[in-house]
């Protein structure tokens, strides 16, 4: 059960990172105009290939962006999932810290009892 929760939290974190990455990439993406056409036919051919690749990249990027942030509800759900993931991660860390402290206190209590028993 705990491993399932960890997987869910990991998926949520990846979702948040994807939202952030797509948002940042969308605001900073700059597609060039192609280049200089002074090389004649070879230059035009390279420019056409480059333009085609850029259009393909742009369409893939836009489809990915639309899939992640295309709808306000989807974005809100993604952000809610991020909040849940962070809260779950913090709770998990808090539990681990408590367990470690409890184990240390048990070990120290056991060690003290052994010392008292040896002295007697």
Swiss-Prot record:
Record keywords, A-Z: Cytoplasmic vesicle, Membrane, Secreted, Signal, Transmembrane, Transmembrane helix
The keyword Secreted is assigned to this record: yes
Residues making up the signal peptide according to the UniProt record: 1-25
Source taxon at top rank: Eukaryota
Disulfides per UniProt: none
Localization terms from the record: Secreted; Parasitophorous vacuole lumen; Parasitophorous vacuole membrane; Cytoplasmic vesicle, Secretory vesicle
Membrane-traversing stretches: 76-93
Acidic residues bias spans: 110-120
Entry keyword annotation includes Cell membrane: no
Region entry Disordered, spans: 27-59, 100-120
GO cellular component labels: membrane; symbiont-containing vacuole membrane; transport vesicle
Ranges annotated as biased composition (Basic and acidic residues): 100-109
Role this protein plays: Plays a role in the function of the cyst and parasitophorous vacuole membranes and therefore in host-parasite interactions.
Name this polypeptide is given: Dense granule protein 5
Gene (name only): GRA5
């Amino acid at each position: 059960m705990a491993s399932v929760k960890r997987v869910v939290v990991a998926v949520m974190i990846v979702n948040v990172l994807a939202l952030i990455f797509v948002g940042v990439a969308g605001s900073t993406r700059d597609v060039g105009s192609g280049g200089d056409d002074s090389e004649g036919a070879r230059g035009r051919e390279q420019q056409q290939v480059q333009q085609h690749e850029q259009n393909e990249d742009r369409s893939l990027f836009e489809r990915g962006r639309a899939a992640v942030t295309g709808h306000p509800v989807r974005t809100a759900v993604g952000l809610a999932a991020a909040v849940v993931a962070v809260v779950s991660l913090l709770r998990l860390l808090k539990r681990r810290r408590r367990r470690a402290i409890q184990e240390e206190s048990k070990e120290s209590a056991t060690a003290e009892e052994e010392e008292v028993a040896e002295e007697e």
